[in-house]
Amino acid sequence: SAVAIEVLLAAVGDPFQAFATGLLLGVVEADQPVLLAGGSQMAAVLALALQALPPSARQGLSNQVLLGTTSWLAAECLQASAGPSSLMVLLRNLEQHFSVSLQAYAAGLRFSNSRQSRLRDFEQGHVKEGVGAGGLTLLAQWRGLPLSRLVMACDRAVDQLLAHGQHGKAAP
C-alpha cells in the first residue's frame, strides 16, 4: 500500500528536508530560481516537492531548480558497474516518475593537487561531505573564482584547523 509522504519523511527524513520542501513549494509562486546544494538528499527534497504539486505544475518547479553537487558525488557508483553514477540513475528515475526534466551540475573542484592529504582523500572516495560544498563551489565558479584559489583556501583552512587542534583549542 502507498505510504503517506508525512509518514515516510518522519521515518527516514530529517526536519530540514521538510523545511526545504516547503521552501520549494513557495518558490513555485514566487517564480524565483533556486540552487539545491546537495546530491541525493536534495534530490529527495525535490521529489517530495514534485509529489506535493499537481502534475501540471511540476515542470514549472523543475525549470526553477538547479541541483548542485560535488564532482565526487556526481561520479559515485554504489554498484560495481561501469554505468552511469548512482546520482544520475536517481535523477533519471525522478524525471521518468514525475515526467519532468531536471537540471543538475557538478562543481569542478578537485583536490588532487592539494597540499593536504586529508583533502586528497576526497579523490580516493574516502571522504564524503554533506554540507552543500558542491553548490557553494558552483556559485564561486559561476562568479569567476578560479578553482585553484579555492584549493589553496581549503589548504589554508586545514592548516588553521590543525594548528588550533595541536594547541588544545577548539577551532574557530
Task: Tell me the role of every PLM-derived stretch.
Residues 1-172:
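N-terminal loops that bind phosphate or other acidic moieties
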